[in-house]
């Protein structure tokens, strides 16, 4: 059934923050199979409204929860897609194409099927199965999983272990389980100089001269050597804007944007202080004014592999005959919110095709993912 569910889900053009009825589809499906469900819409204005779903079957412990998102990134130029239809599932040559198939509607379809099969085959299982889904993971992530977790805990629901269906695997299904994530902090630096003619530099103050010095030092910072589970922290410059299209004018100001992805040896505040010291030193030397802003998108986190995490890894190995590695690589995810409530793993399809034109997954990979999810639920809820 996971293929049918996946094809249906691809058909919903659920570009962040729109659910576009994808969550309502899942809500109806789970209700028909005896789940208690609740849809909540959070957001300060209509343009920011986010649709969220919590659904649970059973009332015992442990409560194993699948956490995911139905929203997808924009499809780009439709003409570059097979059949020019990114929101219509296209099955060919043992693959399924469509926006969101990898990130992460394929994982949702597999866990839906695994959960419903377990309920059908083991009606007296011990514990609970639940789903927490949002339409705002690819965007600001402000009114999605974070708020929904707080809401369900206020309603006295408790999750004992979560599986987040992000595409984690690298070259084959089963090779990677995420148990943490790097942090991310974005910087915006504005430097104010003095506009002038390039022939009279002594009558101007070029803010680019200062910025070049600053960025040169920043990109050469060796933040750390990495840790057991984390790669080294790194800074990337993402944009420089002077608003100057002429070659004979020294610009009045310049803006630069850069991002740091950091491990658990740092936090956003200490990194902000470090960057501020460097910027302040050069701006004083060049006698220019500056404004530095930074916004933390996420702090880093790491979990010690506890028994449930190890159990999940054992299920992956016994099911797929491959020993998974624990990793923290990649971008941020909603796991950063879930970890405040329970232990978790992130495990899904191959990450290579996520967000790309002609995003696809092999049908055989869907079967492998389903097998892992089903066997894990069996292990946790039936001991068979």
From Swiss-Prot:
Cofactor binding: number and manner: Binds 2 Zn(2+) or Co(2+) ions per subunit.
Signal sequence, renumbered to the chain: none
SUPFAM superfamilies: Bacterial exopeptidase dimerisation domain (SSF55031), Zn-dependent exopeptidases (SSF53187)
Binding site for Zn(2+) 1: 69, 103, 166
UniProt: Zn(2+) 2 binding residues: 103, 138, 355
InterPro entries listed in its UniProt record: Bact_exopeptidase_dim_dom (IPR036264), DapE_proteobac (IPR005941), Peptidase_M20 (IPR002933), Peptidase_M20_dimer (IPR011650), Peptidase_M20A (IPR050072)
Pathway: Amino-acid biosynthesis; L-lysine biosynthesis via DAP pathway; LL-2,6-diaminopimelate from (S)-tetrahydrodipicolinate (succinylase route): step 3/3
Enzyme Commission number(s) of this protein: 3.5.1.18
NCBIfam families per the UniProt record, alphabetical: dapE_proteo, PRK13009.1
Protein name: Succinyl-diaminopimelate desuccinylase
Organism whose genome encodes this protein: Rickettsia canadensis (strain McKiel)
This protein's encoding gene: dapE
């Amino acid at each position: 059934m996971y293929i049918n569910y996946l094809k249906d889900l691809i058909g919903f053009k659920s570009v962040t923050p729109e659910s576009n009825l994808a969550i309502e589809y899942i809500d109806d499906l789970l209700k028909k199979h005896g789940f208690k469900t609740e849809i909540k819409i959070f957001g300060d204005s209509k343009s920011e409204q986010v649709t969220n779903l919590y659904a649970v079957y059973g009332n015992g412990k442990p409560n194993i929860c699948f956490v995911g998102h139905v929203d997808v990134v924009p499809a780009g130029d439709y003409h570059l897609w097979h059949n020019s239809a990114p929101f219509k599932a296209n099955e060919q040559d043992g693959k399924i194409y469509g926006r969101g198939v990898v990130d992460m509607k394929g994982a949702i379809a597999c866990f839906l099927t695994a959960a419903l099969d377990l309920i059908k085959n083991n009606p007296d299982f011990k514990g609970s199965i639940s789903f927490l889904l949002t339409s705002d993971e690819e965007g600001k992530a402000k009114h999605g999983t974070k708020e929904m977790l707080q809401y369900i805990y206020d309603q006295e629901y408790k999750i004992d272990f979560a599986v987040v269906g992000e595409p984690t695997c690298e070259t084959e299904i089963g090779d990677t389980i995420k148990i943490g994530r790097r942090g991310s902090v974005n910087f915006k630096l504005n430097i104010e100089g003095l506009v002038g003619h390039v022939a009279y530099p002594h009558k101007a103050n070029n803010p680019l001269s200062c910025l070049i010095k600053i960025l040169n030092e920043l990109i050469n910072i060796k933040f750390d050597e990495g840790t057991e589970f984390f790669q080294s922290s790194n800074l990337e410059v993402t944009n420089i804007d002077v608003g100057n299209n002429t070659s004979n004018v020294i610009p009045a100001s310049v803006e630069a944007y850069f991002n740091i992805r950091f491990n658990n040896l740092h936090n956003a505040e200490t990194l902000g202080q470090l960057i501020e010291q460097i910027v302040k030193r050069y701006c004083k030397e060049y006698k220019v004014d500056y404004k530095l802003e930074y916004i933390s998108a996420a702090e880093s986190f790491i979990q010690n592999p506890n028994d449930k995490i190890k159990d999940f890894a054992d299920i992956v190995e016994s099911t797929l005959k491959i020993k998974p590695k624990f990793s923290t690589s990649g971008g941020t995810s909603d796991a950063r919110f879930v970890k405040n409530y329970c232990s978790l793993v992130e495990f899904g399809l191959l990450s290579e095709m996520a967000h790309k034109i002609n995003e696809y997954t092999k049908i055989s990979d869907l079967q492998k993912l389903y097998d892992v999810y089903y066997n894990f639920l069996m292990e946790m809820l039936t001991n068979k």
